[in-house]
Structures are given as structure tokens and as C-alpha cells.
Amino acid sequence: MANKSAEHSHFPWKHIVGFALSIVLTLLALWVAVYTDLSSSAKLWIIFGFAFIQAALQLLMFMHMTESENGGIQVGNTLFGFFGAIVIVLGSIWIFAAHYHHGDHMDGNPPGGAEHSEHSGHNE
């Protein structure tokens, strides 16, 4: 019991360091967005990278993910969730970008061409 009270009475250095790193990452993202001459897509990728690092930092420093008995399982589940989210977002962007340029929607015909607008055998 005395061990737990001594454990809770120390200064929260881990939280201070996490907060300071979060501020630094936010200011770096602001600097990249405002003061660099990079292209918009490069800025976007860099800011997303900083956001991903900051999310991991928040989870590890403030959410105490690794401090329980099954901390490894929590980290694994979180990484799997991030992987699933990244696959869904990047897959959606890929599908939208790859199929937007086919041009089927530009000529007024339904996708697949005019030959598919009426199904054979269903004409009245």
C-alpha cells in the first residue's frame, strides 16, 4: 500500500514530456504548412505523418496502453486497427482516382457504355 502511494506522489515527467512533444509536433506541422515552399500534396503527407506520430504518442504517453498486464495485446489491437483504417482510406482513394479518369461519365451515357443501357431480352 505504501508502495502505491509513493508511486502516485512523484512528478508526472512522462506526461510533461508527452505534452511538450505534442506541442513540438503541432508547431512543426504549422511550420511546414505556412513557411515551406513544398507542393500541397507533399505538405499533406508530411502533416499526416506528424499526425500519425502524435496519435501514437498520445496513446502511449497518456492512455497508459503498455502499463497493464496485457499491454502488448492492446498495442497489437491498436496497430491492427490503424492498419485497417489505412487500408480502407487508401483503398478508397485509389478506387476513386483510378476509375474517375475512364471517361464513361463524361459523354452522358451510363457507365459501361450505351450498349449496356438496355438489357437484351428485357425490351418491351
Curated annotation (Swiss-Prot):
The keyword Aminoacyl-tRNA synthetase does not apply. Its EC number is 1.10.3.-. The keyword Membrane applies. Its main location: membrane. Coiled coil: none annotated. The chain crosses the membrane at residues 16-36, 44-64, 78-98. This is Quinol oxidase subunit 4.
